[in-house]
Amino acid sequence: MEQMDAHQIISFIQNSKKATPVKVYLKGDLEKIDFPSDVKTFITGNAGTIFGEWAVVEPLLEANKANIEDYVIENDRRNSAIPLLDMKNINARIEPGAVIRDQVTIGDNAVIMMGASINIGSVIGDGTMIDMNVVLGGRATVGKNCHIGAGSVLAGVVEPPSAQPVIVEDNVVVGANVVVLEGVRIGEGAVVAAGAIVTKDVAPGTVVAGIPARELKKLDAKTASKTEIMQELRQL
């Protein structure tokens, strides 16, 4: 999938059909209810479950109060513009609780851990691990064989469209609870220490730390050993 630019994302959101889907468990004299074709029904006898848009389901429930003994509604969004990514055929390990929106590219053997939030237009390279509770903003790009530590935030940009998103090149290790501001590029093989706030570009093969992040040294054998990417964790 080709990465979307900001104007394409804005157009996608603007033109998308906004959705408020609901799931309703109900019981009663359901055979007397004429369910419209755009409501999916899974009903046996006097109980069942229906799925549909709230704009359709709400008047249906109201019009059939006499035939419905009780019901419970589940709803997790309102006028949502972007659906979640269909993950069934992605060649990656994606753990429960990750929230990944549509139009995200995920490379082969990538790992997305619990609680990660990945916004529209983001790109995750082959073999990259996105750890727990990481946030990838819109259009944020992470290269191959990287590790983005738990709780880190890579700023994304949809508006203003002229701004640039974060770009992380290949073989980068980002520690836990790092914040990388919009427009920053982290060069290949760099290491960002935990808790850093990265406000400017990071040169390839360097180690940075602090608030704001500053270069400490060039990547050496000791640091490389401590930040080794384990391919065993990426096998499917």
Curated annotation (Swiss-Prot):
Record's keyword terms, sorted: Acyltransferase, Amino-acid biosynthesis, Diaminopimelate biosynthesis, Lysine biosynthesis, Repeat, Transferase
Function as written in the Swiss-Prot or TrEMBL entry: Catalyzes the transfer of an acetyl group from acetyl-CoA to tetrahydrodipicolinate.
Superkingdom of the source species: Bacteria
One annotated GO biological process: lysine biosynthetic process via diaminopimelate
Single Gene Ontology MF annotation: tetrahydrodipicolinate N-acetyltransferase activity
Name used for this protein in its record: 2,3,4,5-tetrahydropyridine-2,6-dicarboxylate N-acetyltransferase
Pathway(s) where this gene product acts: Amino-acid biosynthesis; L-lysine biosynthesis via DAP pathway; LL-2,6-diaminopimelate from (S)-tetrahydrodipicolinate (acetylase route): step 1/3
Record field: catalytic activity: (S)-2,3,4,5-tetrahydrodipicolinate + acetyl-CoA + H2O = L-2-acetamido-6-oxoheptanedioate + CoA
InterPro entries: DapH (IPR019873), DapH_N (IPR013710), Hexapep (IPR001451), Hexapep_transf_CS (IPR018357), Trans_hexapeptide_repeat (IPR050179), Trimer_LpxA-like_sf (IPR011004)
Species for this entry: Listeria welshimeri serovar 6b (strain ATCC 35897 / DSM 20650 / CCUG 15529 / CIP 8149 / NCTC 11857 / SLCC 5334 / V8)
NCBIfam families linked to this entry: DapD_Ac
Transmembrane residue ranges: none
EC number, as in UniProt: 2.3.1.89
PROSITE patterns hit by this protein: HEXAPEP_TRANSFERASES
Family: Belongs to the transferase hexapeptide repeat family. DapH subfamily.
